[in-house]
């Protein structure tokens, strides 16, 4: 360390000695000075690094050489490479598949690569971006047999090579490189687009290989150094060429009437340089080739006249439509029927035009109806047990008319009361108790078809069914007796004669019922009136709605008339009321509060026994 610090002082000390020696030997010539300076330079050169660094600072040439050597070593050692790890990280960055074979696109542009390598695992690539790198050679693409697009623009390529594995390549971009000759492209059978702009193409021989590219449709040769007009012969031999770009080449100035000539010679061309080749341009160019500028001018005038005629025809058609619309509007304002257009009437009459649509609509309607019936048959096929279903449906239809007339009351009534009401109405029409039992059995069979026993058990169940009907008939007859006395005023006068004419089998039951009523008439009268008043009203309504024997208004009038008759005959009833309390029960149940008031008045007029009055007080004030 100490010698390194002392070295600058020694150098500083030696400098004045050199100057003094030079001053002392001032008389000596310049040759002596040069020799001394050279000797000092030679003494500085040595194995030590410090002497080498001082030498680099003194000589600029040696400094540049040293820097260039370091730069080459850095580029060889530290330059970006297409390693597998780098490619995997890149796939993660671009949200691609980590499995290499699953990726169809790989973005490797603007990375500074100088070689194409480590792409063997990426066998499913369809598009490979390698633009803006330092690639000097096309190589290592043997595994990319499915590649369609290869972008190698803005690189350091000098030659087209190693493209044989890319049999499905469709687009190749080699712009902005240093390629001097188009070659090795005939091995690409489906190549459609080739971009060779900004390269070093000069002569016809440089593009002669394009004759072998039979499927090439898009060719970009702009901004090269092509100057020979004979390149058109090469371009003519390309049967599928549609798009051509020769801008920026000297040949565009060397070919007279460049656009017309190229358009005429390339028959399939649709786009030249910066704009398309329209049919009008092609027709004018062909006319120019036939007869010069005069023929071209005439052809152009014809095209312009045709275009003008198309425009005028369209405007006239619009004006005609507007005029016809105004005429129709005027006719409608005047109340006249607008006449059809003359053109339409001459070609086809409106009736003939309207008939086919009407026929078609009718056919469509018929087809729709048939299809709807077929769908109905498929969805609702006829079943073997149709009779049973019909019975149930008839039963429901008989029950449905009761609903709209008595919605408020049907919410409080049960299904059993409805069935009993139907049976009671049938009994009050003048039929016997046997008929009522038969009707009850029929309704039960209709409503409970699913509950019927099997055919094997029918014989053993006959007696039990008869017993059940007898047992079930008893509460129905009780309800009939209670409701018929309350509901039907016409039957109030003669319930017992009907019972006398009944068969002997049922007289016992009915006599027992009425015997109970006679024994406990005073005790049961008030509860029956409270219970049977709403049922009596419902029975009257159901009788008027179901059987429609008498309309509601005449029925009310008859009730009022009966009430008036009873009021007129009330003075003769008090004696009977004291003797028999059953006669007061139908009056109270039929007329409600009004009947109760009349019964009370009759009781006051008749002056019944004290025992009867006490019982009335006990049971009447609940």
Swiss-Prot record:
Listed Low complexity bias regions: 48-59, 337-351
InterPro entries recorded: Cilia_flagella_integrity (IPR050576), Leu-rich_rpt (IPR001611), LRR_dom_sf (IPR032675)
PROSITE patterns named in the record: LRR
LRRCT domain location: 249-288
GO biological process: axoneme assembly; cilium assembly
GO molecular function: dynein complex binding
Record-listed Phosphoserine modification sites: 349, 464, 487
LRR repeat boundaries on the chain: 101-123, 124-145, 146-167, 168-189, 190-211, 215-236
Composition-biased stretches (Basic and acidic residues): 22-42, 62-80, 326-336
Location relative to the cell: Cell projection, Cilium
Protein's UniProt name: Dynein axonemal assembly factor 1
Organism: Peromyscus leucopus (White-footed mouse)
Source lineage: Eukaryota, Metazoa, Chordata, Craniata, Vertebrata
């Amino acid at each position: 360390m100490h010698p390194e610090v002392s070295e600058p002082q020694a150098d500083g000390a030696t400098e004045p000695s050199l100057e003094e020696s030079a001053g002392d030997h001032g008389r000596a010539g310049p040759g002596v000075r040069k020799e001394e300076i050279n000797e000092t330079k030679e003494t500085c050169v040595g194995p030590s690094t410090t002497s080498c660094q001082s030498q680099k600072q003194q000589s600029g040439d040696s400094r540049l050489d040293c820097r260039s050597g370091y730069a080459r070593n850095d580029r060889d050692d530290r330059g970006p490479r297409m390693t597998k790890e780098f490619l995997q990280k890149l796939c993660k960055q671009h949200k691609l598949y980590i499995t290499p074979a699953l990726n169809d696109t790989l973005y490797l542009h603007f990375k500074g690569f100088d070689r194409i390598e480590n792409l063997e695992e990426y066998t499913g690539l369809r598009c490979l971006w390698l633009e803006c790198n330092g690639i000097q050679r096309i190589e290592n693409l043997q595994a990319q047999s499915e590649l369609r697009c290869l972008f190698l623009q803005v690189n350091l390529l000098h030659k087209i090579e190693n493209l044989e594995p890319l049999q499905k390549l469709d687009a190749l971009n080699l712009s902005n490189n240093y390629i001097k000759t188009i070659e090795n492209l005939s091995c690409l059978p489906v190549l459609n687009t080739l971009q060779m702009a900004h390269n070093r193409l000069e002569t016809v021989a440089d593009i002669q290989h394009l004759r072998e590219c039979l499927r090439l449709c898009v060719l970009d040769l702009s901004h090269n150094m092509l100057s020979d007009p004979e390149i058109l012969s090469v371009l003519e031999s390309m049967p599928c060429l549609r798009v051509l770009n020769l801008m920026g080449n000297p040949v565009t100035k060397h070919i007279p009437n460049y656009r017309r000539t190229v358009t005429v010679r390339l028959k399939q061309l649709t786009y030249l340089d910066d704009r398309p080749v329209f049919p009008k341009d092609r027709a004018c160019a062909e006319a120019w080739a036939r007869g010069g500028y005069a023929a071209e001018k005439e052809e152009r005038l014809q095209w312009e006249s045709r275009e003008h005629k198309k425009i005028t025809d369209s405007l006239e058609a619009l004006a005609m439509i507007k005029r016809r619309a105004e005429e129709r509007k005027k006719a409608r304002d005047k109340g006249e029927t607008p006449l059809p257009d003359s053109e339409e009437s001459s070609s086809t009459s409106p009736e003939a035009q309207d008939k086919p649509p009407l026929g078609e609509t009718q056919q469509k309607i018929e087809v729709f109806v048939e299809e709807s019936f077929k769908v109905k048959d498929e969805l609702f096929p006829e079943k073997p047990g149709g009779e049973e279903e019909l019975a149930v449906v008839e039963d429901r239809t008989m029950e449905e008319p009761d609903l709209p007339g008595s919605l408020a009351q049907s919410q409080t009534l049960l299904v059993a009361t409805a069935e009993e009401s139907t049976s009671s109405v049938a009994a009050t029409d003048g039929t016997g108790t046997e008929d009522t039992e038969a009707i009850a059995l029929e309704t039960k069979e209709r409503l409970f078809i699913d509950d019927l026993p099997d055919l094997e058990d029918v014989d053993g169940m006959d007696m039990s069914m008869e017993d059940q009907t007898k047992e079930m008939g008893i509460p129905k007859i009780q309800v009939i007796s209670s409701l018929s006395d309350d509901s039907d005023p016409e039957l109030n006068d003669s319930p017992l004669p009907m019972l006398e004419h009944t068969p002997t089998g049922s007289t016992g039951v009915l006599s027992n019922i009425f015997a109970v009523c006679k024994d406990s008439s005073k005790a049961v009268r008030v509860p029956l009136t409270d219970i049977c008043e709403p049922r009596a009203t419902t029975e009257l309504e159901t009788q008027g709605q179901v059987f429609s024997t008498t309309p509601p208004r005449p029925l009310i009038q008859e009730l009022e008339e009966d009430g008036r008759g009873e009021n007129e005959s009330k003075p003769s009833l008090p004696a009977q009321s004291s003797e028999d309390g059953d006669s007061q029960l139908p009056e109270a149940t039929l007329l409600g509060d009004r009947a109760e008031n009349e019964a009370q008045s009759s009781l006051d007029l008749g002056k019944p026994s004290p025992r009867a009055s006490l019982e009335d007080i006990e049971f009447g004030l609940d």
